Design a protein with these regions (language model features):
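Residue-level recognition of oxygen-bearing side chains
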Residues: 86, 93, 336
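Hydrophobic residues on the short alpha-helix immediately C-terminal to a glycine-rich phosphate/catalytic loop
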Residues: 94, 160, 340-344
Length: 366
């Protein structure tokens, strides 16, 4: 059982990331390395081909798979769930540090983000994001997986863990099973959110809606918004190229409006406080799921979450870590985050065969 003390991850002096240098993965390179696939959010399933039902369904979602085919049905996967507002591109520098292993790994892109479609009249929520994740697991024949959840993806993960607990309790077929979870800079407890008022809380207001219209249509507005958004630590000298790529990932397919439309995720967490009680989920799942938590020392969005985690999860043996820097560990310290992911993936058997694999109806992953 892990110590209740929080482990601090050391960092070398100077900028830990080559994000401003020539090794940085650009947004266009990232999206070119994945694919858009048709998805039916009503049936909650990935489609082999577009069936031609007409608008607005089906929609298309971006995904990126890192794997050496063929991937056997008895292989444990690594699933990467993105943050808000940068989506899967937020993992681009981490992915570069990871290289081909651990794998197979699946990067999910939610509707509204990155190169996925951005439907206007759509009820964005953590629940529908969980539906998409499960649909992608079925499509790829994923039976067991470790999950890395960054930022607001913690809420989709909490919904997935609760569904898993409910299936286990009812004795139902498990489908894809989460063996381990690593939550980084995410919301853990509904009563511990502390976002600065001029960030996510402002974005969900009419002022935020208007601001994102200007962000989409007026050059330079979104980059200025991101620079002022407290995403980085004061000591991190974010480059113009980094901001431009973050902006490109967010603006893609008219995506700035998603920052307003999806900004109510804290309210959603509070409405589902009992269902998404992480301490209760950890107790009820017991030793069937290993849970690891990490925060950042200079994160202004969720500083109270790690304090609450030490009090509520530490006694349950949950591993808790501190990264240096600000909220976007993915940008400031991608190498440190990649090292942590690699170590946990190794410990939890990512890429290794599962004992007694059963036949799967999922497709063979490319």
């Amino acid at each position: 059982m892990a110590s209740t003390a929080t482990q601090r991850i050391p960092v070398a002096r100077g900028r830990s990331s080559e994000a401003a240098g020539h090794l940085r993965v650009t947004a266009s390179e990232w999206f070119a390395s994945g694919a858009r696939r048709p998805y039916d959010p009503i049936a909650k399933t990935m489609l082999e081909t577009v069936r031609g039902e007409g608008p607005p369904w089906p929609l298309h979602v971006f995904e990126k798979v890192v794997a050496t085919p063929p991937v056997g049905s008895g292989t444990r996967w690594l699933t990467m769930l993105p943050g808000y507002p940068d989506g899967s591109y937020g993992f681009a520098q981490v992915d570069r540090h990871l290289g081909p292993a651990p794998g197979p790994r699946l990067y999910v892109e939610y509707l509204g983000q990155g190169d996925s479609d951005k439907p206007k009249d759509y009820r964005y929520s953590s629940v529908e994001r969980a539906d998409l994740i499960q649909a992608q697991w079925r499509a790829h024949g994923v039976r067991r997986t470790m999950v890395v959840a960054f930022d607001y993806s913690s809420l989709a993960l909490l919904e997935l863990l609760r569904r898993q607990q409910e299936r286990d309790a009812a004795g139902e077929e498990p489908g894809a099973t989460i063996d381990a979870a690593f939550i980084v800079n995410g919301g853990l407890f509904a009563d511990s959110h502390s976002h600065p008022w001029d960030t996510t809380p402002m974005l969900k207001t009419p002022v935020g809606r208007v601001g994102m219209w200007f962000g989409q249509h007026v050059p330079g507005v979104l980059e200025a918004t991101l620079r002022a958004a407290k995403l980085f630590s004061p000591s991190y000298e974010v480059s113009a190229a980094e901001l431009a790529d973050l902006g490109e990932a967010i603006l893609r397919r008219n995506g700035a409006a998603f920052m307003h439309r999806a900004a109510g995720f804290v309210d959603e967490h509070r409405r589902n406080a009992d269902r998404w009680d992480l301490a209760a989920i950890v107790r009820e799942l017991g030793d069937t799921v290993a849970v690891h938590i990490a925060g950042s020392e200079e994160d202004p969005f969720e500083p109270r979450q790690i304090t609450a985690a030490r009090e509520r999860l530490g006694p349950l043996g949950v591993d808790i870590q501190w990264f240096p820097g600000g909220h976007l560990t993915t940008s400031e310290h991608p190498g440190l985050l990649a090292d942590a992911i690699r170590g946990l993936a190794r410990a939890h058997g990512v890429g290794q065969p599962i004992s007694h694999p059963s036949p799967t109806t999922g497709e063979t992953t490319r």
